[in-house]
């Protein structure tokens, strides 16, 4: 509708909607740039009506099933129904693959919605690119910490991804800020950190993998990292479990 702001290619191009005419949208370019094919479109604040599973996604699920994939990453789930549909398609294709839900939509962050998504998924990926475009980069750090904590309390896998070592696409060494970013994700309890363009199109893919591995190994030596290694499911709120966990931590 008029006044909506569309963000293209991870926010590099910004358009403001003037009016819509059926399937045609007339916009004013607020921030220009070169738009390449297959780039994403986000609505500032969330609310796009696009379905999580496209026809191409459904075909790709069949390919993943034939390839005997262990995991399938579901992009842009709005709610748990999207996860359930993906699991249904995998089952019908004869696949036992688990679903990792990529948290990229503002709508999926509501307390009840994210918990239902976690309950239906093997784990979540904190996909900071599209998520940051929708909610704003300033909110990302707190949201990332919240999602890691929620995943761990639900005993689910959590992966932190996007621009972890972005500068290493073109440089052989990471910035200090990137080192801190990776280390803090590990210290918060993420199960995995993931490289994207750094290894897909970067000039120093091996350096990037080694740099990330080195940071993770050093962060895991921290006492804080050892304390976050155990998942505290809600049943540990019982007195007996709490005493047992306290004894274990004291012994360690």
Residue ranges and their predicted role:
Residues 1-252:
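Non-catalytic helical/linker scaffolds that mediate oligomerization, partner binding
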């Amino acid at each position: 509708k008029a006044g909506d702001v569309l963000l293209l290619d991870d926010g590099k191009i910004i358009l403001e909607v003037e009016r819509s005419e059926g399937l045609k949208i007339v916009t004013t370019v607020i921030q220009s740039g070169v738009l390449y094919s297959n780039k994403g479109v986000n609505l500032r604040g969330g609310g796009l009506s696009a379905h999580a599973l496209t026809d191409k996604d459904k075909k790709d699920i069949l390919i993943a099933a034939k390839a005997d994939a262990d995991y399938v990453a579901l992009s842009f789930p709005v709610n748990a129904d999207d996860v359930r549909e993906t699991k249904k398609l995998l089952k019908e294709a004869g696949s036992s693959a688990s679903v990792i839900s990529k948290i990229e939509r503002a709508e999926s962050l509501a307390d009840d919605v994210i918990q239902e998504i976690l309950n239906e998924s093997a784990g979540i990926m904190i996909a900071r690119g599209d998520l940051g475009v929708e909610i704003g980069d300033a909110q990302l750090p707190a949201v990332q910490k919240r999602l890691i904590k929620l995943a761990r309390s639900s005993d689910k896998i959590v992966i932190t991804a996007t621009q972890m070592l972005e500068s290493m696409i073109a440089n052989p060494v990471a910035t200090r800020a990137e080192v801190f970013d990776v280390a803090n994700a590990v210290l918060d309890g993420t199960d995995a950190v993931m490289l994207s363009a750094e290894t897909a199109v970067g000039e120093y893919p091996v350096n990037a993998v080694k740099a990330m591995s080195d940071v993770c190994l050093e962060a895991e030596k921290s006492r804080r990292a050892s304390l976050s290694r155990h998942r505290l499911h809600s049943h540990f709120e019982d007195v007996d479990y709490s005493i047992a966990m306290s004894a274990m931590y004291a012994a360690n």
